[in-house]
Every structure is written in structure tokens, then in C-alpha cells.
């Protein structure tokens, strides 16, 4: 399966930490998508957030007509054990199949979605409370957040 990475996965070194068995690391372009800092991370990210200045957003992607997104592409065998860890780590994302210029088949992209859809599809109330509610977080997908400063060191 081909993964389209846009944050830390733009680095082959970081991608290999996530998917040790990846093959064919290269760049690609997604038309109609853009990067956005639009959601709060879970409890592990509490130490990098600055709530008072709203500098607490993690990177995600969203559809946007006319935009183009450079991504890292990597082929990851479906039997790769690290898939399970990846899905757990990226729990709050919507996994979507996207068309990539020059690829005969879609790639998987971690995309933004709404709190309502996230809670309805992937994170029922008890799970949401465990991940976010106990820390006073009532919504994670927002459009007024600023990037957590830690992320900006990569740009």
C-alpha cells in the first residue's frame, strides 16, 4: 500500500522509524489538497501546547480546490506490523484514499475531519473522554488555532 506523508513523514529517516520495511521512498503531488494546522494533539502533546496563545495545533491536510500538496510517497507492505502502531498514533485523522499524479492506484493520506464525524465514526464517548475529555478538551478540530511552535522548526 502506498502512503502519502506530509509532516514528519516527509523525511525518509522519520518515515523509516514509522515504517521500517518501507520501499520506494519518493516525492509526489496531490492536487486539490493543502496542509493546515487545524487540530489539537492528544495527551502526549500537552507539553508542547501554549494554550494562552492558541499555539497548539498539529499538522493535517484538507481538500482545497486549486491547491497542490507535495508529499512523500512510500510503499509499505500490508503485513508490516507497524501499521497497527501508525493507526493508533494517528487516531484522530480520517484515513482517505487519494489520487497522486503518476500513480496507477490511490495512496493513503491522513486527513482532517470534523469532531462530529470523528466521534461518530472512530471515537465513541468513553474513548473520547479517555483521550481528550479528562484534559478539558471538548473539541480537537478547530480553524482558529496556531501551530505548536515545535512543529515550526521543521519548516
Task: Label each region the model flagged.
Residues 1-155:
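A glycine-rich, hydrophobic/aromatic-adjacent loop/helix-cap motif
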Amino acid at each position: 500500500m502506498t502512503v502519502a506523508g506530509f509532516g514528519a513523514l516527509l523525511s525518509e529517516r522519520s518515515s523509516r522509524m514509522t515504517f521500517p520495511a518501507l520501499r520506494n521512498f519518493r516525492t509526489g503531488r496531490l492536487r486539490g489538497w493543502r496542509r493546515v494546522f487545524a487540530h489539537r494533539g492528544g495527551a502526549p502533546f500537552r507539553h508542547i501546547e501554549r494554550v494562552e496563545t492558541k499555539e497548539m495545533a498539529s499538522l493535517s491536510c484538507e481538500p482545497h480546490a486549486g491547491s497542490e500538496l507535495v508529499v512523500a510517497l512510500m510503499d509499505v507492505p500490508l503485513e508490516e506490523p507497524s501499521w497497527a502502531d501508525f493507526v493508533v498514533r494517528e487516531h484522530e485523522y480520517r484515513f482517505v484514499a487519494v489520487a497522486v499524479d503518476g500513480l496507477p492506484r490511490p495512496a493513503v493520506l491522513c486527513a482532517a475531519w470534523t469532531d462530529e464525524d470523528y466521534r461518530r465514526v472512530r471515537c465513541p464517548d468513553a474513548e473520547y473522554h479517555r483521550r481528550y475529555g479528562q484534559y478539558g478538551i471538548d473539541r480537537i478540530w478547530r480553524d482558529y488555532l496556531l501551530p505548536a511552535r515545535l512543529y515550526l522548526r521543521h519548516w
